[in-house]
Amino acid sequence: MTEAENKIKNTYQYFKETDMVNEFEIKKQICDIGKRIYNQGMVAANDGNISVKLNDHEFLCTPTGVSKGFMTPEFICKVDENGKVIQANEGFKPSSEIKMHMRVYKERPDVKSVVHAHPIYATSFAIAGIPLTQPIMPEAVIALGCVPIAEYGTPSTEEIPDAVSKYLQYFDAVLLANHGALTYSDSLLNAYHKMESVEFYAKLLFNSRLLGGPKELSKEQVARLYEIRRQFGLKGKHPANICLNNKKGEFSCHNCESCGAG
């Protein structure tokens, strides 16, 4: 073998080993996020699933039938863009909800991670058929805008991906009717933070309703918050960027239904 060939071989081996190290670190991060959503009561028993995009053809995901609070890196599976197994240790299979994750990645190339959980308050709103559309807190308006409810679908079938699909180009968080919540973003941490934000928003809305109903922000206040978001240059989809009424200079609010959230 020539010196040039040796150099190419060593370079290839370096990148291969580096990729393996990076994958292991990502697996550890997935386990950490799984522990967080479990400890915060966002999932029970074996509920929920998490995935991370490595590249256009490789994805890491949590296994089915395993508590997300007690995972270790060897639990994590690798699948292709069709959800087919590339690598999984004995006894582990990819989440049964992998179809939903793959639909998000297919229709949102900017997304690098997806988190699905069953947070108590957000899921309660999903069960009651009430979308999170009331502008009650600046942080929620800026970070989420509003959170629609995707129609009910049978878990592990194409029904949920089909139901979620219509909202993917407009929102970074969706409630799943009678099921839970789905968030996605440009990193695992950001996808998790969106799930936290959805649950916090839902909890505040629930509690304020118990106290006689929330005092909503005015349309002018919401418009100013939308402008702040634009100035921040925050990534992802948001009603501030796609609201049809807002584009026409008309009243833009969290339940005007021009974006399908109402």
Predicted segments, located by residue:
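Acidic, Ala/Val/Gly-enriched low-complexity intrinsically disordered segments
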Residues: 3-5
